[in-house]
Amino acid sequence: MGRGRVEMKRIENKINRQVTFSKRRAGLLKKAHEISILCDAEVSLIVFSHKGKLFEYSSESCMEKVLERYERYSYAEKQLKAPDSHVNAQTNWSMEYSRLKAKIELWERNQRHYLGEDLESISIKELQNLEQQLDTSLKHIPSRKVCK
């Protein structure tokens, strides 16, 4: 016997809302992983909690690559839909602004990761890449000390 349908409205109780968010987020991440494996699809998922905490999943090794690919695709789509040069110029500026804003957010997120913050939201592969980058950076420090 299955459960009844849940009415789609905001859950007023803060604790119940948080529990539901955590469970549904886990289910969503699991489904994203399953579809990437079963269908050999490239899947990326970005979820922000109501407090702004980032949760992400990427079937690729790096979310940045997927975001860059998405930017290129959406840019090409917008170019095809905007033949007017004035509208096109305005679109280019707004797209450039959006692209740079996304890049800044990405750099800020990476900086937080380098400082050891928000690590629970990234995958094992990304943690391994982060560890490798930090090891490489640490190996360069003695050579810089010698140069000075």
Swiss-Prot record:
Stated name of the protein? Truncated transcription factor CAULIFLOWER C
Keyword Acyltransferase found: no
Instruction: Indicate where this protein resides in the cell.
Output: Nucleus
Q: What else is known?
A: This is a truncated version of CAULIFLOWER that may contribute to the 'cauliflower'-shaped floral meristem (curd). This trait has likely been selected by early farmers during the domestication of modified inflorescence structures.
Give the chief site where it resides: nucleus
UniProt keywords, alphabetically: Activator, Coiled coil, Developmental protein, Differentiation, DNA-binding, Flowering, Nucleus, Transcription, Transcription regulation
Q: Which GO terms describe its molecular function?
A: DNA-binding transcription factor activity; protein dimerization activity; RNA polymerase II transcription regulatory region sequence-specific DNA binding
Q: Which organism is it from?
A: Brassica oleracea var. botrytis
Subunit annotation: Homodimer capable of binding to CArG-box sequences.
Residues in MADS-box domain copies = 1-61
